[in-house]
From Swiss-Prot:
It is an enzyme of class 2 (transferase). GO terms for molecular function: protein arginine N5-methyltransferase activity. Its EC number is 2.1.1.-. Its main location: cytoplasm. Keywords: ANK repeat, Cytoplasm, Methyltransferase, Nucleus, Repeat, S-adenosyl-L-methionine, Transferase. This is Protein arginine N-methyltransferase 2. It comes from Cryptococcus neoformans var. neoformans serotype D (strain B-3501A) (Filobasidiella neoformans). One of its GO terms (biological process) is methylation. The gene is RMT2. S-adenosyl-L-methionine binds at residues 120, 186-191, 209-211, 236-237, 265.
Length: 363
């Protein structure tokens, strides 16, 4: 018996097992009655780690899923193999059931966040070289902050970000003046190096970075000495939520009218922080041809949770007047497995990456 079962009194435990059984065969009305009696919809059995929602998903009965979700079933509960009920629907080709679970996730997760950026900024980082010879940064707990694997992997993710942000932009054409770039979160500097390798080079390149050791690394590598590069020390909130400082940030852009491309990837900030960043984009992105993208890694260890996070981001970008176009990037399994050796916490475990490119909506 697991810890959740041990903390249920006998009457609730009986109701929990009745609900589990009913979810496999009974009509939606029976499920509703059990929930009305107080059956715990969050309960998961010992054998498979399945909840009532998992069993209902196996039946391909949309109404059962709706009743259970309305009764408190947890949309993102995972079984012993890390699968949500959404993955059960996907494996059975049940698009309707999967959409019901995904949409519930979007509704319920609107106010969630993860990580603690302020704690991270005070933590000690370690620069390490993996067996592949690539440099990586680990935090004090051994979590990957910025991995050297992103360099080989960049040809299917990071390079793709830069490509999508710059391709066919009028200022990125040969002979043009170059784009005005803002990158928030330096890491190992891979994205910034790729921007610098563009032809023409950026006419202006601002980097916002807050971690003291990363700032030391920037100066050690001489990034601050590159032509047209400006380093702003501090959190993006310090610069972009301060009315006076926003003017300073925009001072390097043509006529102060906004950046041509903005990319953000800040480790240990949760979705609430990303959503707050969305809200300042209309003030700092060039309205005519500006493009915005972000590292889309929230929930990236589970396909259903990842889909919910991506859909939620799209909705919130639309709320502030941006339209999003998604680009799917394939990640080879061999590469996904190799890069996590020696790292405690994975933050990517999916075969594909959804790359967002957002532009101001045309009115």
């Amino acid at each position: 018996m697991d810890m959740d079962s041990a903390h249920l009194d006998s009457s609730l435990l009986t109701l929990a097992f009745r609900l589990i059984k009913a979810a496999q065969t009974a009509a939606p009305s029976v499920l509703a009655d059990l929930l009305a009696e107080g059956a715990p919809a969050w309960f998961q059995d010992d054998d498979l780690g399945w909840s009532c929602l998992h069993y209902a998903a196996e039946r391909k009965e949309p109404e059962c899923l709706e009743v259970l979700l309305q009764g408190g079933a947890v949309w993102n509960a995972v079984d012993k193999w890390g699968r949500t009920a959404g993955e059960i629907c996907l494996s059975l080709g049940d698009e309707e059931g999967w959409s019901i679970i995904r949409n519930e996730g979007i509704r319920s997760e609107d106010k969630t966040s993860a990580g603690d950026n302020l704690v991270f900024l005070k933590s000690k980082l370690t620069w390490d070289v993996g067996k592949d010879g690539k440099e990586r940064v680990l935090d004090a707990d051994g979590n990957g902050v910025m991995m050297g694997w992103e360099e080989p992997l960049s040809y299917c993710i990071v390079v793709e970000h830069v490509k999508r942000l710059t391709e066919e932009h009028p200022k990125a054409e040969l002979g043009a003046e170059g784009m005005s770039i803002l990158n928030v979160g330096f890491g190992l500097g891979i994205v910034d190096r790729l921007f610098q390798e563009c032809d023409p080079k950026p006419s202006h390149h601002t980097i916002i970075e807050a971690h003291p050791q990363v700032l030391e690394y920037i100066h050690k590598k001489g990034v601050h000495l590159l032509p047209n590069v400006r380093i702003l020390q501090g959190r993006w909130q310090d610069w972009l939520l301060d009315g006076e400082k926003v003017g300073d940030v925009l001072s390097g852009t043509p006529d102060g009218m906004g950046f041509d491309a903005i990319f953000v990837d800040t480790f240990a900030e949760g979705y609430e922080d990303l959503k707050a960043f969305f809200e300042v984009i209309p003030d700092i992105l060039n309205a005519d041809n500006g493009r915005f993208s972000f590292w889309n890694g929230l929930g990236a260890t589970n396909p259903t949770i990842y889909a919910v996070s991506s859909s939620l981001a799209e909705l919130h970008l639309e709320d502030v007047g941006l339209q999003v176009e998604w680009h799917d990037v394939l990640i080879p399994e061999s590469m996904r497995e190799e890069v996590w050796k020696g790292v405690r916490r994975r933050y990517w475990d999916l075969p594909g990456y959804r790359l967002p490119i957002a532009k101001m909506s045309l009115i």
